[in-house]
């Protein structure tokens, strides 16, 4: 369990790995757990802020689930001041930072050094793996340079995975990659490539996203709060409810009695999970895996 406010940074020097989508999806996941969230958009494209403005035009701003702030990460002093301010704000539980897909910005160093958790999404492909390995090596050298000041836990996420793609030699490389990356942090289960995982909203969550990310996000959530149950009771209303934005797929469920979701395990198999995150028949022994 980490003392809040907790800073979680989504980062990789390789673009196109789903970093921004995972950041927003995790924000929606945390809101459903009663967590007070602020999202800091430091990506050069500012996709999250653009999405928030679009969402406000579409849904209004009466019930925004969390604030989105936009910053340019080029100023080292400004970023240092920002993370210090966020770490001392009692009104915030978790800060999510979407960093740029580049290491050129000078303000990234104080962000990485002061993060409690760094989430590194990547693809199993011959272009992304070397770039991600280089980024992990950069973080490791930064940790050695600053010493105990950098305490970030690393969660390395194989994102947008397609089990149908890859020659036998490549699949062997994927396994070796997982083993190598585990020397730098915790390599989570795979998040599959699905259309729902390539779009996001800063106001309305997607039920279909939950099934793909819950097992991975539960691990990160547990590392922060030491449990998988909500930190506080929160009644989501209107657009904040996890109704699928696609009316052909979305299903309204009995929210007064709790919601049962379909989650994906590491092998891509589906299983029912209660709103708290664990499957209904999880044993005490299995629960210890979150520790």
What is the meaning of each model-derived region?
Residues 132-145:
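Conserved C-terminal guanine-recognition region of P-loop GTPase G domains, centered on the G4
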């Amino acid at each position: 369990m980490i003392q809040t406010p907790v800073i979680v940074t989504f980062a990789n020097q390789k673009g196109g790995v789903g970093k921004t989508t995972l950041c927003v999806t995790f924000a929606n996941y945390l809101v459903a757990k009663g967590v007070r969230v602020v999202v800091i958009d430091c990506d050069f494209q500012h996709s999250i802020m653009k999405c928030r403005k679009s969402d406000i035009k579409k849904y209004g701003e009466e019930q925004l689930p969390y604030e989105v702030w936009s910053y340019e990460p080029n100023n080292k002093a400004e970023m240092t001041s920002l993370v210090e301010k966020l770490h001392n704000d009692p009104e915030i539980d978790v800060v999510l930072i979407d960093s740029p897909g580049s290491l050129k910005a000078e303000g990234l160093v104080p962000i990485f050094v002061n993060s409690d958790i760094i989430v590194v999404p990547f693809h199993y492909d011959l272009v992304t793996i070397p770039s991600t390995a280089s980024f992990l090596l950069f973080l490791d050298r930064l940790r050695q340079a600053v010493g105990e000041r950098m305490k970030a836990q690393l969660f390395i996420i194989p994102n947008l995975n397609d089990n149908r793609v890859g020659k036998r030699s490549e699949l062997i490389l994927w396994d070796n990659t997982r083993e190598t990356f585990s020397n730098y942090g915790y390599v989570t289960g795979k998040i599959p490539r699905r259309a729902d995982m390539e779009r996001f909203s800063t106001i309305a969550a997607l039920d279909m996203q939950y099934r793909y990310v819950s097992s991975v996000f539960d691990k990160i959530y547990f590392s922060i709060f030491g449990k998988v149950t909500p930190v506080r009771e929160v009644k989501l209303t209107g657009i904040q409810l996890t109704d699928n934005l696609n009316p052909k797929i979305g299903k309204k469920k009995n929210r007064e009695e709790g919601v049962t979701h379909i989650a994906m395990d590491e092998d891509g198999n589906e299983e029912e999970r209660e709103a708290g995150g664990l499957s209904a028949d999880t044993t005490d022994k299995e629960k210890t895996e979150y520790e």
